[in-house]
Curated annotation (Swiss-Prot):
This is General transcription and DNA repair factor IIH helicase/translocase subunit XPB. A motif (DEVH box) lies at residues 450-453. Changing T478A: Inhibits growth when overexpressed, dominant-negative to wild-type in vivo, inhibits transcription in vitro, promoter opening occurs and no longer requires nucleotide, promoter clearance and RNA polymerase elongation do not occur. GO terms for cellular component: nucleotide-excision repair factor 3 complex; nucleus; transcription factor TFIIH core complex; transcription factor TFIIH holo complex; transcription preinitiation complex. It holds the Pfam family ERCC3_RAD25_C. ATP binds at L348, P349, C350, G351, A352, G353, K354, T355. GO terms for molecular function: 3'-5' DNA helicase activity; ATP binding; ATP hydrolysis activity; DNA binding; RNA polymerase II general transcription initiation factor activity. Component of the 7-subunit TFIIH core complex composed of XPB/ptr8, XPD/rad15, ssl1, tfb1, tfb2, tfb4 and tfb5, which is active in NER. The core complex associates with the 3-subunit CTD-kinase module TFIIK composed of mcs2/cyclin H, mcs6/cdk7 and pmh1/tfb3 to form the 10-subunit holoenzyme (holo-TFIIH) active in transcription. Residues 14-36 have a biased composition (Acidic residues). Residues 1-61, 220-255, 736-761, 782-804 are annotated as: Disordered.
Length: 804
């Protein structure tokens, strides 16, 4: 307390004194019943007219007011009371939104983290405090691995500092009570909704969305009726579902028509109750899965692959020399349980061995596999990885790309393709159509979706229903999108089954320890003046081509090359990419680089000691595997994309051969100060900060001015560069859309427009900037001139006279 407050206390102003004390009352010790050090005894001596009870009540109210003012809407002191031994418990739960705050420094943190990863989704995991969120889909995933509702509640209560809020208990019960009651089953390339409870199927068939999507056998031809699944118990079970009083009334009732598609199967060996089902259309699978999740009956997708005698087995096993790491084994344990495979998503950081996880899953299921990637280069890498880690024969692996259209000739095999090849809806060549008929005409045991975050895109999401597969596994390092479609993966693929902790893997040496830094580059006076005058697109070009940023890039390349590092420089802007690379004498790859030249540059970067730096556009975000790279410099990016930032960091995350103490990889993001680029940079870093990475801010690179042959050191050079930038048209500010999802393959996007709308000056209309003024649709102008109805009466008279 300040000296002034002490003097006021001596002057005998009890009300004022009580208010001052309330600001510094026992907030830190709130809830500790044994501590009497902050009892309001001194105030009683000051205010002799108040009783002890009255003073204590006023103190508590004032203290509560101080807490509410400090924490606002996050003040739960009235809702949550601390347990007596709360210091020994590691977490507490927000009663409003289901957030879980975990003390990562607690002795029980490791056990708590394993449990929380199973029942919730990680939101933020820095060094000392972790944040998780309980969602409906995370609880579905928890129940799918065998956890029971009461067990989830009991363990949470054991770990929580406070009693579990009733709202959270009710939410857990509501989300887990109906999970597993309805299954999506694939039989002979036909989809069925299956349940052991006929009343649940009645509920689904009454739904206005699901009901019309079933296949109604009454409208099928006699031939189609004969193909309906049947056995000895079908008729009796069907009667059990649809018959209310008698056979005659059931035939006339509308409920009989509604449930005529419900068919019972034979009793299973481990279940005494009959199983009931109805068939749905292939094209409606996505809609039904989404609707079932909305009405709290999520479809369970499990594959009893060991008892599948219809689909042939694939002869594949891991090689004896192949060893999987503990976190890879843990992720697979979430997928497999009770001899069955579940559909879902596994999230592992770049360089942590996602490919080996997928191959191990394929070796476990031992059925035909289709692997979908983002590019043709990834396709060849997956094929090579299958041959490296497993004992599969080369002729059992087929490749389906623009250049290769192979089929395996055995009963079972592996097909590796791209999302674009499968999702294409345009006219196909004869070979491509024949290959697609092969993919869609058979039943697949396992579909593996690499970089699964691209699936929610409108173009790619159709691949999930185009290919009929028993089990789906999605792999990604960055389960984030900027269009809020990432939640669609929960019903398109399945819930997130496992997400690794990046910092934990780095500490154990499974991935590199990366030092992240943001280098602030001041804008030169000339460039900043033009930046303030230009439009938004040209502004981007100005802050990317900032001479100070160029010098920082040159200095960092020189510094790390002398250390023996291999450096990747990323730029989404192709004009800047070419300008930087040509000025510094380095190789560069962008969307227009031929495939053969790309591979030659990458091989030189990997094996040639004289090639230590390459420049890449966004084509290298996800499609290259360069474990030799130890330093990454980013000079231009795709606005505020969090996913791209993490994917680029992943280019240097693979465990390094150099085991230096401390950091063994470096990530620099060059940002022009006082520009819009700083805003985008802060947005991009959000995902990595949530993973526990810290970004240092570097405002001055010591020794940069003394670098020999420093580019644009004189004002004349900077002015010349500025003139070159200003002479560029707006197209130079475009980002490289060059096949970032088809690195080395033909893009299936629309062909570029023959003309582009652009602003320009009079000199542009006169032929500058390689532009031309062309007037289209001249006949329409003539027609308007002839049309007299649109003219005023005075002008119509003049026009009539002229025509005569």
């Amino acid at each position: 307390m300040s000296l002034k407050r002490k003097n006021n206390a001596r002057e005998g102003t009890p009300d004022e004194d009580l208010e001052e004390y309330s600001d510094y009352s026992d907030v830190d010790n709130y809830g500790e019943e044994d501590d009497d050090s902050y009892k309001p005894a001194p105030r009683i001596r000051i205010n002799n007219n108040k009783t002890k009870a009255q003073t204590t009540t006023n103190s508590n109210e004032a203290r509560q007011s101080g807490i509410s003012a400090m924490f606002g809407q996050n003040d739960f002191s009235n809702l949550l009371g601390l347990k007596l031994d709360h210091t020994a418990r590691p977490l507490w739960i927000n009663p409003i939104d289901g957030r879980i705050i975990l003390e990562a420094f607690s002795p029980l943190a490791e056990q708590a983290i394993d449990f929380l990863v199973t029942i919730s989704e990680p939101v933020s995991r820095p060094a000392f405090i972790h944040e998780y969120r309980i969602t409906a889909y995370s609880l579905y995933a928890a129940v799918s691995v065998g956890l029971k509702t009461e067990d989830i509640i009991a363990v949470l209560d054991r770990l929580s500092k406070t009693p579990i809020p009733p709202s959270i208990v009710d939410f857990i019960r509501a989300c887990t009570v109906s999970y597993g009651k309805v299954k999506l089953v694939l039989k002979k390339n036909r989809y069925f909704i299956e349940s052991g409870d006929a009343s649940v199927l009645r509920l689904l068939l009454r739904d206005p969305v699901i009901g019309p999507l079933r296949i109604d056998y009454s409208t099928q031809s006699s031939k189609q009726k004969s193909s309906k699944p049947s056995n000895e118990d079908n008729v009796e079970d069907k009667k059990d579902i649809t018959n209310d009083s008698s056979k005659e009334t059931a035939e006339k009732s509308s409920s009989d028509e509604l449930f005529s598609a419900v068919v019972g199967l034979q009793e299973e060996e481990d279940d005494e109750d009959a199983v009931h089902l109805f068939e749905i259309k292939h094209s409606s699978v996505e809609t039904i899965k989404k609707r079932c999740a909305e009405i709290d009956y999520p479809l369970l997708e499990e594959y009893d692959f060991r008892n599948d005698n219809i689909n042939p087995d694939l002869p594949i096993d891991l090689k004896p020399s192949t060893q999987i790491r503990p976190y890879q084994e843990k992720s697979l344990s979430k997928m497999f349980g009770n001899g069955r495979a579940r559909s879902g998503i596994i999230v592992l950081p770049c360089g942590a061995g996602k490919t080996l996880v997928g191959i191990t899953a394929a070796c476990t299921i031992k059925k035909s596999v289709i692997v979908l990637c983002t590019s043709s280069v990834s396709v060849m890498q997956w094929r090579q990885q299958f041959l490296q880690w497993s004992n599969i024969k080369p002729d059992h692996i087929a490749v389906f790309t623009a250049d290769h259209k192979e089929r395996f000739h055995s009963e079972a095999g592996v097909v590796v393709s791209t999302y674009s090849m499968v999702a294409n809806t345009r006219n196909r060549s004869y070979d491509s159509q024949k290959m697609m008929d092969f993919l869609t005409g058979r039943e697949w045991g396992f579909i593996l979706l690499d970089e699964v975050h691209v699936v929610p895109a409108a173009m790619f999401r159709r691949v999930v229903t185009t290919i009929a597969a028993h089990t789906k596994l999605g792999l990604t390092a960055t389960l984030v999108r900027e269009d809020d479609k990432i939640d669609d993966l929960n019903f398109l693929i399945g819930p997130k089954m496992y997400e690794a902790n990046w910092m934990d893997l780095a500490q154990k040496g499974h991935i590199a320890k990366v030092q992240c830094a943001e280098v602030w580059c001041a804008m030169t006076t000339e460039f900043y003046n033009e930046y303030l005058r230009e439009n938004s697109r040209k502004r981007m070009l100005l802050y990317i081509m900032n001479p100070k940023k160029f010098q920082a890039c040159q200095f960092l390349i020189d510094y790390h090359e002398k250390r023996g590092d291999k450096i990747i420089v990323f730029s989404d802007n192709v004009y800047a990419l070419r300008a930087y690379a040509i000025k510094l004498g380095k190789y560069f790859i962008y969307g227009g680089t031929p495939q053969q030249e790309r591979m030659r540059i990458l091989e030189n970067f990997q094996y040639n000691e004289l090639v230590n730096t390459i420049f890449l556009s966004k084509v290298g975000d996800t499609s290259i595997d360069l474990p030799e790279a130890t330093c990454l410099i980013q000079i231009s990016s795709h606005y505020g994309s969090r996913r791209q930032e993490a994917q680029r960091l992943g280019r240097i995350l693979r465990a390094k051969r150099r085991n230096d103490e401390g950091f063994n990889a470096f990530f620099y993001s060059l940002v022009s100060k006082d520009t819009q680029e700083m805003y985008y940079s802060s947005k991009r870093q959000a995902f990595l900060i949530d993973q526990g990475y810290a970004f240092k801010v570097i405002t001055n690179l010591k020794g940069m001015e003394n670098l020999p042959n420093l580019a644009y050191a004189s004002k004349a050079e900077r002015l010349e560069l500025l003139q070159e930038v200003l002479l560029q048209n707006e197209e130079a500010a475009d980002l490289d859309d060059g096949e970032d999802t088809s690195f080395g393959s033909r893009s299936l996007s629309r062909a570029p427009a023959k003309a582009k709308r652009s602003s320009g000056s009079l000199s542009t209309l006169a032929g500058a900037d390689n532009m031309a003024y062309v007037e289209y649709n001249k006949s329409a102008n003539k027609q308007l001139k002839k049309d007299s109805k649109e003219h005023h009466a005075l002008f119509r008279k003049h026009l009539y006279t002229k025509r005569r």
